[in-house]
Regions:
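Charged DNA-binding/catalytic regions of mobile-element recombinases
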Residues: 1-285
């Protein structure tokens, strides 16, 4: 209260006289008096607002490197240290991933393709190597199964489908979406696990019709299809595990928005120079 009185009459009487009259020290008053905001503090406030917005748009997936790339692309002059400091000071944390269970049904007598990929996930152009797999999401209506096809060149999801049953038709619909979208040339490697959906006669017949080279993982080796496993871990951490799903349709709409509205066009990958799959393909064209 005394400090506020000094501030009110400062200028009309000397600060020293007011302090002596009210029995307070000059140092105490200076420590209490609000200091003007510096330009750097103002800049921090602007940067923090952008960080909060990108944290929301990225569903909490961007740590310091990706966040810095995003802000720099927007024209902000920021570095990794400043972004990291502001995120730490304001409790802005990254969503962590968890291990996923396998859904492979390999207890069958169907033919299995050789492992052409052999854990070489690199490609020099789109439509050289594709990989597919199936995962599952729990809803209050029961399981929802998700099949995806990913282009290993850009990590882009080029085909996907959902169903309440993990049958071959689910995998076939994801493949047909990918083929219709990309029109891959003959000889594209198509890699999956040994699941019965992918080993089925109908699925293998489609692969031959479209000119794919079929490739399958070794028995029980999840690392042979690590790229798709990584996508599922990311999807579940950034979307699936963050809320309960009451009906399958609700989850399906959210998957559509995540894949087509965020993951493909916006989500940055360190392996792609912190570019999104769509941007990486566009700049490489």
């Amino acid at each position: 209260m005394r400090f506020a009185y000094i501030e009110q009459y400062d200028g009309k009487l000397s600060q020293g006289e007011l302090c002596r009259f009210l029995e307070v020290t000059d140092r105490g008053y200076r420590a209490w008096r609000p200091r003007p905001i510096s330009q750097r503090q103002r800049d921090d406030m602007v940067i923090l607002a952008h960080i909060r917005e990108q944290h929301r748009l990225s569903v909490g997936s961007y740590g310091r490197p990706r966040m810095t790339e995003e802000l720099q692309e927007q024209g902000l002059a920021v570095g990794h240290r400043r972004v990291g400091r502001l995120m730490q000071q304001n409790g802005i944390k990254v969503v962590r991933t968890h291990k996923c269970k396998a859904t492979t049904d390999s207890a069958h007598n169907l033919n299995v393709a050789p492992n052409l990929l052999d854990q070489d996930f690199t490609a020099t152009a789109p439509n050289q190597k594709w990989a597919g797999d199936i995962s599952y999401i729990w809803t209050h209506q029961g399981w929802l199964y998700l099949a995806v096809i990913i282009d290993l060149y850009s990590r882009r999801v080029v085909g996907w489908a959902v169903s309440n049953k993990m049958k071959k038709d689910l995998a076939i619909r994801a493949l047909e979406m990918a083929v219709n979208l990309r029109q891959p040339p003959e000889g594209c490697i198509h890699h999956t696990d040994r699941g019965s959906q992918y080993c089925s006669h109908d699925y293998q017949k489609l692969l031959k019709r479209y000119g794919f080279k079929a490739s399958m993982s070794g028995k029980g080796n999840c690392y042979d299809n690590a790229m798709v496993e990584t996508f599922f871990k990311t999807l579940k951490a950034e979307l699936v595990w963050r809320q309960p799903w009451h009906i399958r349709r609700q989850c399906e709409l959210a998957l559509f928005q995540y894949i087509n509205g965020f993951y493909n066009p916006r989500r940055r990958h360190s392996a792609l120079g912190y570019k999104s799959p769509v941007t990486f393909e566009r700049k490489a064209a």
